């Protein structure tokens, strides 16, 4: 897995940068634990679902850099 030259940011739009301090290639050294919380919202909705192609432009919009677990790129093909 590529780490974008060691700089895989998980900031806005998941763009490559130094937002997460690199890819944490050596977790035992300078390891910082991050805690996140998730909220699950459940409800009732109509049976009709519409997709307007929003998911189509995600990869191109972010130059192929997607955030995986622990702020690593998965996959990362950004330049």
Swiss-Prot record:
The keyword Transcription regulation does not apply. InterPro entries: Metalthion_15p. Keywords: Metal-binding, Metal-thiolate cluster. Pfam families: Metallothio_2. One of its GO terms (molecular function) is metal ion binding. Belongs to the metallothionein superfamily. Type 15 family. Metallothioneins have a high content of cysteine residues that bind various heavy metals. This is Metallothionein-like protein 2.
């Amino acid at each position: 897995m590529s780490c974008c030259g060691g700089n895989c940011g998980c900031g806005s739009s998941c763009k490559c940068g130094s937002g997460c301090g690199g890819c944490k290639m050596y977790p035992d050294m300078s390891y910082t634990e991050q805690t996140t919380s998730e909220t699950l919202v459940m409800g009732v909705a109509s049976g009709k679902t519409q997709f307007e192609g929003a998911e189509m432009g995600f990869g191109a919009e972010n130059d192929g850099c997607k955030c995986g677990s622990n702020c690593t790129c998965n996959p990362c093909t950004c330049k």
